[in-house]
Structure formats: structure tokens, C-alpha cells
Amino acid sequence: FSHVLGQIDDENNGISGIEKSYDYELKTRKKPLELTVDTDIQFLIREELLKFQTIFNSTGSAAILMNVNSGNIISIVSIPDFNLNKRQQIKDSKFFNRATKGVYELGSVFKTFTLAAAINEKVVEPNTSFENLPKSIMCAGRSIREYDDEIPENLTAEEILIRSGNIGSVRIAQKIGIENFKNFLKKIGVLNKIQFDIDEIGQPISFRWGKCKLATSSYGHGITTTPLQLAKGYAIITNGGYDVKPTLIKKKLKNNKNKILS
């Protein structure tokens, strides 16, 4: 919970996390501020991250579990984390919240956005056939290859996603077009800095769109976002196209009527 709760200074003022964002409320309100995070699930997910961090010898990891309809965050973990009771032993890198502030090229998880955008723009259906897909293509003198040479050359759009095909994803993105794909990603919050309950929020790195950028973005390379924005984007696609605002604070649930995808 260290990144969620945040830190206070020597004068008991919040300087990060919920402690900073809700500093006044925490000092003045009579009732406690209730979070959406489930402590048991938070513990289990943290343990899994630590286990796989050891297996893969990674420097850090993050995970978010969110209700796709309400936006309530059930678990949000960033590793490494820290113990505020042992401040002198904390390295600065442990303060960094990878789940909300870390900006990454997230790779193949973007292929879901590519297919969703194509379906939303009505240029592709799940059973649309793509034939004679090569194992590699050239763009501006650089090669884009399939990660798996066993991927068949004839696939439907749905099968491209299932098999995680790079070239197939590029072909789908080409049907969408640069402006439509860019606008779709902005609409679902993947390319825009989003409002959240804590201030530690990352900003996707801006870039210039072009044919090659469209191609690589279709499979999640050359385009960045945060895990929190990824969760928001997936939630919108999963819940039927309704906008959702990720939150850590329990509120009275309201029906989500802002449909942003067709």
C-alpha cells in the first residue's frame, strides 16, 4: 500500500499518494476515507509479482485489477515498494510508482486496441480474412518481422489477435488509417494524461505519426503509455464501450451512460 497511501513530511503534511491528494480531507473530515482496494487481493497480487520478479530477474513490476464498469481499483501494486517505518533504508527508486507514473512500450497488449479500433470504425469484423501474410515487411528501410515463424499466412482478424501476429496487426491498422487509430487511442484514454486520485501520473511520450509509426504502434512498439491508462483502455473495450474513470476512493456507484465507442 506504500505507493497508494503515500508519504507525509515531518510536519504531517502529505507529500505523495492519497496523503497528498486528500491532505485537507484527511485532516478535517470526521469519517475515514474509504479506499476501493481489497487488502487480501492486494497481498496476493504483490506476492505473485515478487515471485515472477525473481524468476525473470526483473528490476520492477506493476499490476492493476479494476472493476471495468465502476472504475474501482481493487488492487494496484508497484514493485519495488517501501516501508515508511524504515525511511533511512529506502532508496529513491522505490518511491517510483510504476503502475501510474511508469511510461512504457507495452508491446502485444496493444493488438487488442488495434482490432477494437478496426471493429469500431467498421473496417474489419472478427471473421474478416487476411491472406498471404508474409513473415516480414519493410518500412522505411527497416524490417518488421513475425515473432513466430509458425504463424499461418492466412488468418481471420480474430485469429491474428489470438496468435498475436505482428504482420496481421499491421494490416489491420492500415485499414484503420492514421487519424482514426490516433483518435481511437485518445478516446479511450491511452494517449492522454488522465485525472486520478493521486498526483503521481505519467505522460505518454509524444511522437510524430506516419505510416511506419502506425505499423509499429499496431503491435505496441514505438508508442508508450502507463499501466493505469492501459487498464482504462481495456475496461472501456470490455464494458461495451462506456467511459470509465479509475478511482481509489469508494463512492456511490452511478450508472455509466457515457458511451464513447460504437
Model-predicted segments: where are they?
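Small/polar-residue-rich segments within soluble enzyme cores
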Residues: 1-31, 35
